[in-house]
Design a protein with these regions (language model features):
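Conserved active-site and cofactor/substrate-binding residues in soluble primary-metabolism enzymes
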Residues: 19, 32, 46, 62, ...
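Metal-dependent phosphoesterase signature
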Residues: 51-81
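Active-site neighborhood of HAD-like aspartate-dependent phosphohydrolases
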Residues: 1-49, 53
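C-terminal cap/substrate-recognition subdomain and adjoining C-terminal extension
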Residues: 69-171
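Short connector loops/turns at beta-strand edges and beta->alpha or beta->beta junctions
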Residues: 29-30, 61, 122-123
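Residues that form generic nucleotide/phosphate-binding pockets
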Residues: 27, 37-40, 54-58, 70-73, ...
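Generic secondary-structure boundary/loop-capping signal
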Residues: 8, 12, 21, 56, ...
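Short acidic/polar alpha-helix capping motifs at helix-coil junctions
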Residues: 2-4, 45-51, 66-72, 134-138
Length: 171
């Protein structure tokens, strides 16, 4: 039972180099220190939901087209595509589980070949950000809850999971 069977990966600053929500705030033209807010959240010094709410508020009323600009700036970490492709070929279940947002997470997941993409979802009205979202992975234990559900459904031991991430909420 030591053989690994699941890859659970974070997205921002892990499988890609970017912090995509920070990129969106910067692209929107709002003057703020989002990098520091993100850093504190990743260190567990600020609640992840609070920091998401704060950063999304900066996007309220901004055009949805900012997403296309953010997608154009995504930098994949070297080897990320090979990692996912190889593990898929070896029969792993590969899941991108991120506090980031669809459609960015969907783009990254599809591009790299993840079988599952679990993320929050932006809400839009009249092609603009509303500042609200569907909080699928916003909770402190959201990623752990997903892992528990997946391992229970597949009857796989947690010792058979490879999890990679950079933040306090990354298992």
């Amino acid at each position: 039972a030591r053989e690994k069977k699941i890859l659970l990966s974070d997205m921002d600053a892990t499988i890609i180099e970017n912090e995509t929500l920070d990129d969106l705030v910067k692209l929107s033209g709002v003057e703020t220190n989002v990098d520091e807010t993100s850093k504190l959240a990743m260190e567990g010094k600020i609640d992840i939901k609070t920091t998401l709410d704060t950063r999304l508020n900066y996007l309220k009323g901004k055009p949805k087209s900012l997403i296309d600009q953010a997608l154009a700036r995504i930098k994949f970490h070297p080897g990320s595509e090979v990692l996912v492709k190889t593990l898929n070929q070896k029969g792993f279940i590969t899941s991108l589980v991120t506090g980031g947002f669809a459609p960015i997470s969907t783009f990254v997941g599809d591009r790299l070949g993840f079988q599952n993409v679990i993320s929050n979802e932006f809400k839009f009205k009249d092609d603009c950000f509303t500042g609200e979202y569907v909080p699928i992975t916003a909770g402190k234990n959201s990623k752990l809850n997903y892992l528990n559900k997946l391992t229970d459904e597949k009857n796989i031991s947690k010792s058979q999971v490879v999890a990679i991430g950079d933040g306090a909420n990354d298992l």
